[in-house]
Amino acid sequence: TTTLYFNTPAATSEEVEAEVNDVTTDFIFSKDDVTTDIVSLTSADVDFTANLTLSFSQTSQNVDVITLKKGFSIEMALEGQTQPNGLVFELGDSENYGIKAGEAQTIEFKHDQEIRKGETLKIPVHFKRIQNFPEGQGIYQPGHFKLQTNVIANGTATTPGVPAGNIQVNLITDTEVPDITLQSVTGIVDPKIDINVDPITVEGIPDFLKDDVNLDLENPYI
């Protein structure tokens, strides 16, 4: 949540602007029932859609609508990331939003977007891949997966004619995240696999390794 200050020395019927500069909100996505056969992750292919939501509440005079202007941007980045493009995603509403040129983790508004009092603006974000996990994220302990994400907003907000003075509005950023599905992973796995010779069979392969997976066995022994 950030407070927008719409300042005007006299009552006006013109739009009044407020700047949003590097306003950061932190979110944690977690999953606590990951198979313990996965020891660590380098990357994970995922398939889930999260809604990035924007709404507002007023702390002083009545405001019925604010407008986030064309070019408003929202960056989504892993907390503490040291390599770029940790989050790979597509946008569900490409008519109104796009990926900012040269910044693969930044959503840019193609048009002005109104947020009316009591309503919520939703931006669907379809996540495809997560990679370059910072320390303490991904599989941070057996069976537990976590992402800590920074959402960083920049741009201009406006509101229609207001009385003289300082109009304060709280801009609220949030996310709606369903259950996260890890479709495939690159990393270290440590399943218990039984190998019987004559004929050669491999048994006890966990579900997540059964379909179209090639195994490189390092230092196998019988």
Tell where the protein language model's regions lie, with residue ranges.
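Extracellular/secretory-pathway and virion-surface proteins
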Residues: 1-222
